[in-house]
Swiss-Prot record:
InterPro entries tied to this protein: AP-1-like (IPR050936), bZIP (IPR004827), bZIP_sf (IPR046347), Hap4_TF_heteromerisation (IPR018287)
A GO biological process held by the record: N',N'',N'''-triacetylfusarinine C biosynthetic process
GO MF annotation, one: transcription cis-regulatory region binding
bZIP domain location: 55-95
Species per Swiss-Prot/TrEMBL record: Aspergillus fumigatus (strain ATCC MYA-4609 / CBS 101355 / FGSC A1100 / Af293)
Protein name per Swiss-Prot or TrEMBL: bZIP transcription factor hapX
Family the entry assigns: Belongs to the bZIP family. YAP subfamily.
Lineage, opening ranks: Eukaryota, Fungi, Dikarya, Ascomycota, Pezizomycotina
Residue segments, region Disordered: 19-73, 149-196, 224-245, 397-416
Length: 491
């Protein structure tokens, strides 16, 4: 056999997938008609410094290591993706918060600017008002100075005209007819009125200096100002300090006995005729006549004040105590609770309940809970007499068995408990800070309130009679308040 010859060729970069067919040798003389063939595969030349890559690992441990590394890389990539998503979400929320804060800052800055503008406006307004007040004050001071200067000028004119002798002579002439009341204001006004002269040399038909001087007197000016104040203030027409009605009593014993003296006094006062001043016509009011009428009315006022009785201060010194015969035992007055019961038509009908729905619910529920048909309560569950507790002191059994001595001892031992009205109890409970939360659990704490009088104390024959006012024990109210503290305490 002859070996096949290989043609020289350059080394291929890619390994040959198909083998080249061998060159058929020429048939020899010994083997006529026979052909031989064989495929040859040439591996690629490996790169320098690298191991040949094999797809199948040589051992099982290496295969497990590769799988573990691949799983670790996958988990790490998934964790990185998850963290990236969280960071993106946090950034979005942060941007939303920043936008909201920026909007709030803009709104607050706008409000601050508005408040500043309003403050500047009010400051300018205050300055303007202060300027107006200062101008009015200066004008008022100028008017007061002018008025005082005019008064001083008039006083100087009066002193120059020689009015001083007349003014000193008239009070001495009329001081005997006027009684002394001890009032400084009345004396000043009376002296001011008496200083008016009956005439002067400067009076004419159209102008009288005497009348003007009379109007400018201090007493007349003060009386005119007080009269203006009374007319401008209708709400203060009544005196602020009202006198005691006992002090306003009048003694009528000598009223009709002194009729002759009263008849003579007006004649003596009205005997001097009014001296006409000559400047008052028939249709116009005359100052002289008015002053004379006031002088006539002063003695009447003094006599009226002298007839007043002194107030009876010590009534117990003169009134003896009532005797047994003065008191009638057959007279029975209605109890005060029925007369003063505002809920006579039933619980929840008073004005306070009609104004507050919660108060109405409280009163009606409390009245329903104390009705005789309510569930029995107490330590024994209502097994005592009349459906009450066995420890009750006011049962009918104890009343029937105990004698008079037992009744007196039990009555003295059972002291009356302090009670509150239904309205006061509701007001006390409503002032608790957690009362609004307690209204949702009304059925839990409302039975803890003990009411008086108890329904079993009323006889069956008196059901048609209006019942007494509802009273609540103060101790039970305190217990409910302590229950509120425990129940709604912040933990």
């Amino acid at each position: 056999m002859s070996t096949p010859s290989i043609a020289p060729a350059p080394a291929p970069l890619v390994p040959a997938l198909a083998a080249k067919p061998a060159i058929s040798p020429s048939p020899g003389p010994g083997t006529p008609g026979s052909i031989t063939s064989k495929e040859w595969v040439i591996p690629p030349r490996p790169k320098p410094g690298r191991k040949p890559a094999t797809d199948t690992p040589p051992t099982k441990r290496k295969a497990q290591n590769r799988a573990a590394q691949r799983a670790f890389r996958e988990r790490r990539a998934a964790r990185v993706n998850e963290l990236e998503e969280q960071i993106k979400k946090i950034e979005d929320e942060h941007e939303i918060h920043i936008a909201a804060f920026k909007e709030q800052i803009t709104n607050l800055s706008r409000e601050v600017e508005q408040c500043r503008s309003e403050m500047t406006w009010w400051r300018d307004r205050c300055h303007a008002l202060e300027k107006e007040v200062s101008v009015e004050r200066s004008a008022k001071e100028a008017i007061v100075k002018e008025f005082r200067s005019s008064l001083s000028d008039r006083e100087a004119v009066r002193s120059d005209k020689g009015l001083a002798p007349l003014t000193t002579s008239t009070p001495q002439a009329r001081s005997s007819d006027r009684p002394d009341n001890g009032d400084a204001s009345n004396n000043d006004s009376g002296e001011g009125r008496e200083e008016v002269p009956l005439g002067c040399n400067d009076c004419s038909t159209s102008h009288c200096q005497c009348i003007e001087d009379a109007f400018t007197m201090p007493g007349v000016v003060a009386q005119e100002q007080s009269r203006r104040l009374d007319t401008t203030k209708p709400g203060l027409s009544e005196p602020q300090i009202k006198p005691d009605p006992e002090e306003m009593e009048i003694d009528f014993t000598s009223r009709f006995a002194a009729t002759q003296q009263q008849d003579q006094s007006p004649t003596s006062v009205s005997s001097p005729a009014v001296d006409p001043c000559g400047f008052c016509s028939d249709g116009t009011p005359c100052i002289c006549a008015e002053m004379a009428a006031q002088e006539e009315q002063r003695p009447r006022r003094n006599s009226f004040e002298n007839n007043r009785l002194a107030p009876i201060q010590n009534l117990s010194q003169f009134t003896p105590p009532p005797s047994d015969g003065d008191v009638r035992s057959d007279v029975t007055l209605p109890p005060i609770s029925q007369a003063t019961n505002p809920c006579a038509n039933g619980p929840g009908t008073c004005a306070q309940c009609l104004a507050d729905p919660r108060r109405t619910l409280f009163c009606k529920t409390l009245a329903a809970s104390r009705s005789p048909s309510a569930a029995p309560s107490g330590c024994c569950g209502g097994k005592g007499a009349d459906g009450g507790c066995c420890q009750s002191r006011n049962t009918n059994v104890s009343r029937g068995r105990s004698g008079s001595n037992n009744n007196t001892s039990s009555g003295s031992s059972a002291a009356p408990s302090l009670t509150l009205s239904c309205a006061d109890a509701y007001t006390t409970l409503s002032r608790h800070p957690n009362f609004s939360r307690a209204t949702d659990e009304l059925s839990t704490w409302l039975p803890k309130l003990h009411t008086l009088p108890k329904p079993r104390d009323f006889p069956l024959t008196d059901r048609g009679v209006p019942r007494a006012a509802l009273e609540v024990e103060a101790a039970s109210v305190m217990g409910v308040l302590r229950y509120f503290d425990r129940r709604f305490a912040d933990k």
